[in-house]
UniProtKB/Swiss-Prot annotation:
A molecular-function term among this protein's GO annotations: potassium channel activity
Name of the protein described by the UniProt record: Inward rectifier potassium channel 13
Regulation: Inhibited by Ba(2+) and Cs(+), although sensitivity to those inhibitors is much lower than in other Kir channels.
UniProt entry keywords in alphabetical sequence: Cell membrane, Ion channel, Ion transport, Membrane, Phosphoprotein, Potassium, Potassium transport, Transmembrane, Transmembrane helix, Transport, Voltage-gated channel
Site, as annotated: Role in the control of polyamine-mediated channel gating and in the blocking by intracellular magnesium: E149
Lineage, opening ranks: Eukaryota, Metazoa, Chordata, Craniata, Vertebrata
Gene (UniProt): Kcnj13
Length: 360
């Protein structure tokens, strides 16, 4: 398929049609008019986990600063109510108990709040054991400070250890191809695990999203299989895997691709796998538009042998495709359906799709 012609003649690439799921798996859906408020804030932990790192750092820094400022105001209020701001702390009046030594200004109160929170040790400023209000406020600040530090530490650890980070090492091919396998046309894509640590229990599913004339989105399940593995799961994911969807007459893609000007659609692929070391489930997503489906192409070879006979993966060929000449379908007594496939308004050679049943 000539990419330059696609850019000129393809109505599906206009600004009116945008992705619902980006190539790296992020959703572009916008919730207009959604009622957030307190209901949204109830999931504070989930909000923090979904934040970008720069916003998370800003929120945590602001939390500490606000905590210090609030207790600085409280320490200043204790000194004000106790009459400690107007006296000489080095030579205090008789019968006067100073709650916190040398808190004579708000700056000093903020410094004392900082020392209390970080437990760096008191210097010239320290609370008096004879002032109950100071001891009570000290206990409250220490308790709330420990809770804040525990929450922030847990959030950092949880964000770093998320399975989502492991999913970033899973890579899909930028394009999907339609090529013949066993005499039948198949929609094919590849996925690679770019880290040496294997993944297990790999599952792949796909959903075809189509926009109807009334503006509603219609979802259709698209089944993919992996070579000759009969189960739905691939037990071991260390080298690149190739997934196939047979374009039979019952395939939702077969009906869609035979239109001269097909409506906009998006094929979203989901891959779930288990991390071998932790047992956590990670998921990776991508999507393919009609302009990203190449007919009569197949992927270049990836697996080679090294000098010592070991297997090697040539990742430089991961996104490469090579032209394929369509192979006629050979069957004893097939029911054939000729589909004139068009992508973005361009007529492509016919595919002969044969049903697997035999006539009597």
């Amino acid at each position: 398929m000539d990419s330059s012609n696609c850019k000129v003649n393809a109505p599906l690439l206009s600004q009116r049609h945008r992705r619902m799921v980006t190539k790296d798996g992020h959703s572009t859906l916008q919730m207009d008019g959604a009622q957030r408020g307190l209901v949204y804030l109830r999931d504070a932990w989930g909000i923090l986990m979904d934040m970008r790192w720069r916003w998370m750092m800003l929120v945590f820094s602001a939390s500490f600063v606000v905590h210090w400022l609030v207790f600085a105001v409280l320490w200043y209020a204790v000194a004000e109510m106790n009459g400690d701001l107007e006296i000489d702390h080095d030579v205090p009046p008789e019968n006067h108990t100073i709650c916190v030594k040398h808190i004579t200004s708000f700056t000093a109160a903020f410094s004392f709040s900082l020392e209390t929170q970080l437990t760096i040790g008191y210097g010239t400023m320290f609370p008096s054991g004879d002032c109950p209000s100071a001891i009570a406020l000290l206990a409250i600040q220490m308790l709330l400070g420990l809770m804040l530090e525990a929450f922030i530490t847990g959030a950092f650890v949880a964000k770093i250890a998320r399975p989502k980070n492991r999913a970033f090492s899973i890579r899909f091919t930028d394009l999907a191809v339609v090529a013949h396998k066993d005499g039948k046309p198949n929609l094919i894509f590849q996925v690679a695990n770019t880290r040496p640590s294997p993944l297990t229990n790999v599952r792949v599913s796909a959903v075809l999203y189509q926009e109807r004339e009334n503006g509603e989105l219609y979802q259709t399940s698209v089944d993919f299989h992996l070579d000759g593995i009969s189960s739905e799961e691939c037990p071991f994911f260390i080298f690149p895997l190739t997934y196939y969807h047979t374009i039979s007459p019952s395939s939702p893609l077969a009906t869609l691709l035979q239109h001269e000007t097909p409506p906009h659609f998006e094929l979203v692929v989901f891959l779930s796998a288990m991390q071998e070391g932790t047992g956590e489930i990670c998921q990776r997503r991508t999507s393919y538009l009609p302009s990203e489906i190449m007919l009569h192409h197949r992927f270049a070879a990836l697996m080679t042998r090294g000098s010592k006979g070991e297997y090697q993966v040539k990742m430089e060929n991961f996104d490469k495709t090579v032209p394929e000449h369509p192979t006629p379908v050979v069957s004893k007594s097939p029911h054939r359906t000729d589909l004139d496939i068009h992508i973005n308004g361009q007529s492509i050679d016919n595919f002969q799709i044969a049903e697997t049943g035999l006539t009597e």
